[in-house]
Amino acid sequence: MSEMTPREIVHELDSHIIGQQKAKRSVAIALRNRWRRMQLAADLRQEVTPKNILMIGPTGVGKTEIARRLARLAKAPFIKVEATKFTEVGYVGKEVEQIIRDLTDSAIKLTREEQMAKCKFRAEEAAEERILDALLPKPKEDWDNEKPSDNATRQVFRKKLREGQLDDKEIEIDIAAPQAGIEIMSPPGMEEMTNQLQSMFQNMGPGASKRRKMPIKEAHKLLIEEEAAKLVNADDLKEQAIELVEQHGIVFLDEIDKICKRGESSGPDVSREGVQRDLLPLVEGCTVNTKHGMVKTDHILFIASGAFQMSKPSDLIPELQGRLPIRVELEALSADDFKRILTEPHASLTEQYVALMGTEGVEVEFKDSGIDAIAEAAWQVNERTENIGARRLHTVMERLMEELSYEASDKSGSVTVVDADYVKAHLDNLVQDEDLSRFIL
């Protein structure tokens, strides 16, 4: 679980996302409140429920990017799902309870990695002994009688192994055979039954081992993983993972505006209002049955986001609106924002193109005038056609660099300066012609 302060979280998000301070602050406070809640007494902790967030803003302004970056900062089970992938219970398609099952799977993976990291030292020792046994096998008749000379030889080989002198030497070792992958095709909505059947068939096979010949360096890695897996207690793992999901789990529901009921539609709407009704108990708090055990959703944080271009937040059913109490509006991006997006974030678009062309030996230099012209071109196209936010920069940059990308392999050692004239020469006719920009940019 992350112990970062709200200021630290916002600072980290600032290095990847330009603007949208309100959204960053809300997300940072929500994440910090997870930590604050765990510091309370047990009886009070149970009463403090998360304040779910609804992010509203046009496409391409950073809603999904905030979710992606938050997943790395949270150090907790996190899942991002598209609301449009689900249908009402009883109809063809995924049920919303699958969200919690996927979140639990993510917690199992996270917990297993943590537990294996804790016992890595013991696993390395056990793996080292197995490699030495393969290098210095004892005669069967002398298996129980260890001579001093044998021990001295073993220590010599141990030293060489640790120094990497034996990395390229090949040995034969017994490695746990991978379980046979049994793929079962199931109708949509029956994923849980499929998982149970797969688990049943996999558990029927004995834990056989397979003798393989490989370099010591590769064998050492495989044996460490195998020994670490043996040291992890499966029951404790499930118990800790479920506790982690219940107390620290975060679900990011993207495209929630796409499941708003349209005013002109009539009859049952199984992929819109039906999904909203199914989401209610999850967000409010219920118990979901997963293959790892029962999971309570009372303290899972839900962050929903949507562009709401064809609908508005009030089109969500009232009960769901009430369960998303914190509303954050993200602002549309200006030409100045585009300039900052091109230069300020870590691994910005301009940095990426400079690095990509550098692999061909071509040096690309972006001048301030060129960056201003690119930002202005992207903003103009957004204003004249559909406003798709910062995603327009990808289209404009790809079009701008298309010719150079094609010829880069023949221009090794050359220098290309991207200034206002370069941008005008490559983009001006497309930006000015509305029909061309509509279909090409």
Swiss-Prot record:
It is found in: Cytoplasm. Coiled coil: none annotated. ATP binds at residues 18, 60-65, 254, 319, 391. Pfam families: AAA (PF00004), AAA_2 (PF07724). InterPro entries: AAA+_ATPase (IPR003593), ATP-dep_Clp_protease_ClpX (IPR050052), ATPase_AAA_core (IPR003959), Clp_ATPase_C (IPR019489), HslU (IPR004491), P-loop_NTPase (IPR027417). The keyword Isomerase does not apply. GO terms for biological process: protein unfolding; proteolysis involved in protein catabolic process. GO terms for molecular function: ATP binding; ATP hydrolysis activity; peptidase activity; proteasome-activating activity. SMART domains: AAA, ClpB_D2-small. HAMAP family: HslU (MF_00249). A double ring-shaped homohexamer of HslV is capped on each side by a ring-shaped HslU homohexamer. The assembly of the HslU/HslV complex is dependent on binding of ATP. ATPase subunit of a proteasome-like degradation complex; this subunit has chaperone activity. The binding of ATP and its subsequent hydrolysis by HslU are essential for unfolding of protein substrates subsequently hydrolyzed by HslV. HslU recognizes the N-terminal part of its protein substrates and unfolds these before they are guided to HslV for hydrolysis. Belongs to the ClpX chaperone family. HslU subfamily. NCBIfam families: hslU, PRK05201.1. This is ATP-dependent protease ATPase subunit HslU. The gene is hslU.
